[in-house]
Amino acid sequence: MRKSFGFIALVFLATSCGMLKGSKKMKPRDGVVFYAKEYLGTPYRLGGNNHSGIDCSGLIHNAYKKQGISVSRTVNLLRKEGKRISKDRAKPGDLLFFRTTKKRKLTHAGIVVGQKGGEPIFIHASSSRGVIISSLREGYWNKAYAQTRRLIR
């Protein structure tokens, strides 16, 4: 009896661990968010694209790449990809773009992870705080918000 219980437990653990790790079973949107969250706490580094340091477009590029989706590596090029949508239609995996300087140019982007209080919450690489989750309800981000784009149908 003990041997069969041990065998059943072993089979259960072996199959369930694979299900947790297998991104192929995740929807692409969920996979992008999952992989982006692996960078939480990573310090900001302009031009960075790994856990030692990463910038906003590097975070987006890496999260999408892990799902087998090729996207541009700069905010300037990312802003031309996908379809522009209203922020109230934003779903996990969509991109938010911001103007963080007085210039008209888009300078920052993040990945939507969900909604809170009717506004998107997003993961991004902040130049002062590294990879964090923020909300469009925050005054700074609400004022800097420029557009939302959908790259995954």
Positions of PLM-derived features:
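Sec-dependent signal peptide recognition
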Residues: 2-10
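C-terminal motif of bacterial Sec signal peptides marking the signal peptidase cleavage site
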Residues: 15-16
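Aromatic- and glycine-rich peptidoglycan recognition patches
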Residues: 19-24, 28, 34, 69, ...
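Solvent-exposed, polar/charged alpha-helical surfaces in well-ordered, non-transmembrane soluble domains
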Residues: 30, 34, 38, 58-62, ...
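Catalytic cysteine-centered active-site loop
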Residues: 42-92
